[in-house]
Amino acid sequence: MHKYLVSLGIYPEYKGYRYIKYAIEHRIKSLGKLHKHFPNEPYSRLDRNIRYVIQQQYDKMSHIVPRPTISSLLSNLIEDYYGNTE
């Protein structure tokens, strides 16, 4: 997780780093729980709402960090946690 955030220019010294890291980890775990209830749905469809929530977290920090590409971040994280996203 740390390497993804740093690759986006979000460093531990930023106020809110821990909050964003926690929010993303929590949403990724929630996606896994959702997938258990809806096993026929691809992760890419289930994570739409999760993407929106995480984007809101980044928007709150947009004045201190560069605007990241949330789709690529989530795709990488989901693939790391669960394998192929489709």
Each predicted region: which residue ranges?
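Basic, alpha-helical nucleic-acid-binding regions used in initiation and control of genome expression
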Residues: M1-V6, Y14-R18, Y22-I24, K29-E86
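Helix-loop elements that line ligand-binding/catalytic pockets
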Residues: G9
